[in-house]
Amino acid sequence: MAAETFLFTSESVNEGHPDKLCDQVSDAVLDACLAQDPDSKVACETCTKTNMVMVFGEITTKATVDYEKIVRDTCRDIGFISDDVGLDADHCKVLVNIEQQSPDIAQGVHGHFTKRPEEVGAGDQGIMFGYATDETPELMPLTHMLATKLGARLTEVRKNGTCAWLRPDGKTQVTIEYLNEGGAMVPVRVHTVLISTQHDETVTNDEIAADLKEHVIKPVIPGKYLDENTIFHLNPSGRFVIGGPHGDAGLTARKIIIDTYGGWGAHGGGAFSGKDPTKVDRSGAYIARQAAKSIIASGLARRCIVQISYAIGVPEPLSVFVDSYGTGKIPDREILKLVKENFDFRPGMITINLDLKKGGNRFIKTAAYGHFGRDDADFTWEVVKPLKFDKASA
């Protein structure tokens, strides 16, 4: 009897989606603050709608930051250079409403900058998850990796002129048929590919479909996963000329599943972009990913999830949890012991060990195409820590 398979789907959006535009602006502000003042405390939100971008939040920094310039530069880099494509970076309204971090939070978390790194408390309560799986070289879910890479490829062929009819906004979605092999996920085939991309007035739907298959899908999805039964929905609505902030309002923190694992594992609900590393929504999720990835890379399990939790002002996590979905070579309690011995989950130490005070153009790179599974030296949480265990007893 054939093994039973199931379908699972992940989606992504590319950098011209209004929510992702906002994530990128928020992280561009964070980068600018950290570049001048590594101790900046940043909680920067962004929203956008037709002809308007607003940044607001709480920022305490010694940096001199031109918020309006950051907004316009970020929108321009994405490709929003005229009203026709959804936003004109040089002529849109830019609103700024930034205040300082609450002194109540400041004294509880970092003692107004007097606490040593190991004493720095979590910036808030919350739960964070890290996930890893052996189904791809990146130790990430294949559905998520393919959906994300399709979005990145859409942007690449737009910017290099291969598909000149493309505009910045776009969404992707990939459904894969999986086999559950004792708790491990084994991709069998790609069942459905969905791409909805903004386009100009001149291109036909047939041209869109042909170009997407040739220049986007073919370079991204390995041929071994495609067959004559694979379903393609390419701009199924029939028309997507109006896009970006002109088509939909955008807001920071609305694409948290796209930022992480595409619906696999779990999510604690906290977003990443626009937050400095004292915000454990970000730093906690990063160290949890490093722990989960290290478990898989060290051969301790084929798939796993790590959860950590915090209280505001308290350095040590309240709890650490590991589940290997039955794929562990040793019991989960022993994997958990190794994790606790090898990873320091205190926010101040996460910041040092993952070098999270470095700005520049570091965090804006995370704000589109996922925070995990990226091959980039700035993604320090993707570096595997070898976890040694007694293979003889496994």
From Swiss-Prot:
EC number: 2.5.1.6
Pathway: Amino-acid biosynthesis; S-adenosyl-L-methionine biosynthesis; S-adenosyl-L-methionine from L-methionine: step 1/1
Binding-site list for ATP: 17, 169-171, 237-240, 248, 254-255, 271, 275, 279
A GO term from the CC aspect: cytoplasm
Cofactor: Mn(2+); Mg(2+); Co(2+); K(+)
Gene Ontology biological-process entries: one-carbon metabolic process; S-adenosylmethionine biosynthetic process
Disulfide bond residue pairs: none
Complex formation: Homotetramer.
HAMAP family recorded: S_AdoMet_synth1 (MF_00086)
Protein name (Swiss-Prot/TrEMBL): S-adenosylmethionine synthase 1
Source organism of this protein record: Hordeum vulgare (Barley)
